[in-house]
């Protein structure tokens, strides 16, 4: 019985490995050097977030969310990381300050419009916005962000955790960004009717579709795609199809 028990246990581990569900450390995909390469100018002295977004804070936050950057095969994991940093680099911007081109300049800003005080304005990599999101994110990461929203701009690990929480969490009729980029989202009939198809473009729709999607070609969507293309090039993976949301209705329109 011990022999067969060992065989079954080993078989289960092999199954988890082959299906990409065996827990892995995000650091095996995102090394410190890769982090610095993707976010090359985040510590430019002209950036308001200089020295805030650290590699160690990212890894600590990432490893607290099972599945983030560890789902699927090597290509799938790299695409998720490229997409996450593509979207959040657009949110935190700074491309105009970069001598290496507009898509090497993300993670320059920390607070939306460099505001101060305890309002629920955009903060951190995903620019977490609105009391509801601060409440939900805070409960998920066990921090009181309703009464202390600026923790998202003063604690780098908390800041990354709020961004990854948003990335991993479906809300209403929106799938999670994680499920979209890892190929685990199947569009509903309503999604198909709204031209919301699997790909990076739907992630833009999830994050800011009401402003950016369904309006034809526009600079903001192009910027998000530019960051993503740079990241997948660095990681040597293909970007996939359906990168924009130019012709997608946003999720609020059902």
From Swiss-Prot:
Keyword Disulfide bond set for record: yes
Enzyme Commission (EC) number: 3.2.1.14
Subcellular location: Secreted
Transmembrane domains' residue ranges: none
Presence of keyword Hydrolase: yes
One cellular component term from this protein's GO annotations in UniProt: extracellular region
Domain of life according to the entry: Eukaryota
Segment forming the signal sequence: 1-23
InterPro entries: Glyco_hydro_19, Glyco_hydro_19_cat, Lysozyme-like_dom_sf
Top-level EC class as recorded in UniProt: hydrolase
Active site per the UniProt annotation: 91
Gene Ontology MF, one: endochitinase activity
UniProt entry keywords in alphabetical sequence: Carbohydrate metabolism, Chitin degradation, Disulfide bond, Glycosidase, Hydrolase, Pathogenesis-related protein, Plant defense, Polysaccharide degradation, Secreted, Signal
Annotated S-S bridges: 213-245
UniProt protein name: Acidic endochitinase
Organism of provenance: Petunia hybrida (Petunia)
Lineage: Eukaryota, Viridiplantae, Streptophyta, Embryophyta, Tracheophyta
């Amino acid at each position: 019985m011990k022999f067969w028990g060992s065989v079954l246990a080993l078989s289960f581990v092999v199954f988890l490995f082959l299906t990409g569900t065996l827990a892995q450390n995000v650091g095996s995909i995102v090394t410190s050097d890769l982090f610095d390469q993707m976010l090359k100018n985040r510590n430019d002295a002209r950036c308001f977030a200089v020295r805030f977004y650290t590699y160690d804070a990212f890894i600590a936050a990432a490893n607290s969310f099972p599945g983030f950057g560890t789902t699927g095969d090597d290509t799938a994991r790299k695409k998720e990381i490229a997409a996450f940093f593509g979207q959040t680099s657009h949110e935190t911007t700074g491309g105009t300050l970069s001598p290496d081109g507009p898509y090497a300049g993300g993670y320059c800003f920390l607070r939306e419009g460099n505001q101060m005080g305890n309002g629920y304005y955009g903060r951190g990599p995903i620019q977490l916005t609105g009391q509801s999101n601060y409440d939900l994110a805070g409960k998920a990461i066990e921090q009181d962000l309703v009464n202390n929203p600026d923790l998202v701009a003063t604690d780098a690990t908390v800041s990354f955790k709020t961004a990854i929480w948003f990335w991993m969490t479906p809300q209403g009729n929106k799938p999670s960004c994680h499920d979209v980029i890892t190929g685990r989202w199947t569009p509903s009939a309503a999604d198909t009717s709204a031209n919301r198809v699997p790909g990076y473009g739907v992630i833009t729709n999830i994050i800011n579709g009401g402003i950016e999607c369904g309006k034809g070609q526009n600079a903001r969507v192009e910027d998000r795609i530019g960051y993503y293309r740079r990241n997948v090039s660095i990681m040597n993976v293909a970007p996939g199809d359906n990168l924009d949301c130019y012709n997608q209705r946003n999720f609020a329109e059902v």
